[in-house]
Amino acid sequence: MAKKSMVERWKKPKKFKVREYTRCSICGRVHSVYREFGICRVCFRKMANEGKLPGVRKASW
């Protein structure tokens, strides 16, 4: 989990639009963030397994 001061820092608008980047809304992770859900792959997997993401199911073929 990210420090509270860092979370507040990320929320502030950037001086230049180019400097903005996606972060996980739950843990603050920078890499592998799904834009559609706004969360990282780690949080996505955890929430999907708990059934907290509607319409998401485990693939089986």
From Swiss-Prot:
<feature type="binding site">
    <location>
        <position position="43"/>
    </location>
    <ligand>
        <name>Zn(2+)</name>
    </ligand>
</feature>
<comment type="subunit">
    <text>Part of the 30S ribosomal subunit. Contacts proteins S3 and S10.</text>
</comment>
<dbReference type="InterPro" id="IPR018271">
    <property type="entry name" value="Ribosomal_uS14_CS"/>
</dbReference>
<keyword id="KW-0694">RNA-binding</keyword>
<feature type="binding site">
    <location>
        <position position="24"/>
    </location>
    <ligand>
        <name>Zn(2+)</name>
    </ligand>
</feature>
<dbReference type="InterPro" id="IPR001209">
    <property type="entry name" value="Ribosomal_uS14"/>
</dbReference>
<dbReference type="GO" id="GO:0015935">
    <property type="term" value="C:small ribosomal subunit"/>
</dbReference>
<keyword id="KW-0479">Metal-binding</keyword>
<keyword id="KW-0862">Zinc</keyword>
<keyword id="KW-0699">rRNA-binding</keyword>
<feature type="binding site">
    <location>
        <position position="27"/>
    </location>
    <ligand>
        <name>Zn(2+)</name>
    </ligand>
</feature>
<dbReference type="GO" id="GO:0019843">
    <property type="term" value="F:rRNA binding"/>
</dbReference>
<dbReference type="InterPro" id="IPR023053">
    <property type="entry name" value="Ribosomal_uS14_bact"/>
</dbReference>
<dbReference type="GO" id="GO:0003735">
    <property type="term" value="F:structural constituent of ribosome"/>
</dbReference>
<protein>
    <recommendedName>
        <fullName>Small ribosomal subunit protein uS14</fullName>
    </recommendedName>
</protein>
<feature type="binding site">
    <location>
        <position position="40"/>
    </location>
    <ligand>
        <name>Zn(2+)</name>
    </ligand>
</feature>
<dbReference type="GO" id="GO:0008270">
    <property type="term" value="F:zinc ion binding"/>
</dbReference>
<comment type="similarity">
    <text>Belongs to the universal ribosomal protein uS14 family. Zinc-binding uS14 subfamily.</text>
</comment>
<dbReference type="GO" id="GO:0005737">
    <property type="term" value="C:cytoplasm"/>
</dbReference>
<dbReference type="Pfam" id="PF00253">
    <property type="entry name" value="Ribosomal_S14"/>
</dbReference>
<keyword id="KW-0687">Ribonucleoprotein</keyword>
<comment type="function">
    <text>Binds 16S rRNA, required for the assembly of 30S particles and may also be responsible for determining the conformation of the 16S rRNA at the A site.</text>
</comment>
<dbReference type="InterPro" id="IPR043140">
    <property type="entry name" value="Ribosomal_uS14_sf"/>
</dbReference>
<dbReference type="GO" id="GO:0006412">
    <property type="term" value="P:translation"/>
</dbReference>
<keyword id="KW-0689">Ribosomal protein</keyword>
